[in-house]
Amino acid sequence: MEGLTSEQMVAFQEAFLLFDKNGDGCITLEELAAVTRSLGLEPTDQELNDMMREVDTDGNGIIDFQEFLSLIARKMKDGDGDEELKEAFEVLDKDQNGFISPTELRTVMTNLGEKMTDEEVEQMIREADTDGDGQVNYDEFVIMMKNAERKISG
């Protein structure tokens, strides 16, 4: 999507991959059910179907990455994105120390099939790192994502 930084795309892709269990680039109803249940939620079949219909804008029965991005932008715009932001941060913060380090970012990018130089990783961190400590804390992540939401929604 236009206006997204590399960091924002990484965060969204990582979240998408959590849902896309078989790695085919699409989220099926079954994958949506599995992930929501793994988060401790127990949606009914009707609730799952409603969620799928809300996101699956082209009606083909699966959620692709663009539809997923649209959902995230909508959720953030609706003001209920705080929980989603927290979850996305936790996905990227592999060691759960409250920071996204260059090593964690490199690991995520590698898992997404992106080979990055140390300089590219450092640049991504620098763009979001407002306090200059060399890593991204949750507050910096929230600012970065809110800025992305404004760019997405215009």
UniProtKB/Swiss-Prot annotation:
Ca(2+) 3 binds at residues 93, 95, 97, 104. GO terms for cellular component: cytoplasm. Disulfide bonds: none annotated. Ca(2+) 2 binds at residues 56, 58, 60, 67. The keyword Metal-binding applies. The modification N6,N6,N6-trimethyllysine is found at residue 115. Keywords: Calcium, Metal-binding, Methylation, Repeat. Ca(2+) 4 binds at residues 129, 131, 133, 135, 140. Ca(2+) 1 binds at residues 20, 22, 24, 26, 31. Residues 7-42, 43-78, 80-115, 116-151 form the EF-hand domain. SMART domains: EFh. GO terms for molecular function: calcium ion binding; enzyme regulator activity. The keyword Transmembrane helix does not apply. Potential calcium sensor. PANTHER family: CALMODULIN LIKE 3 (PTHR23048:SF0), MYOSIN LIGHT CHAIN 1, 3 (PTHR23048). Belongs to the calmodulin family. This is Calmodulin-like protein 4.
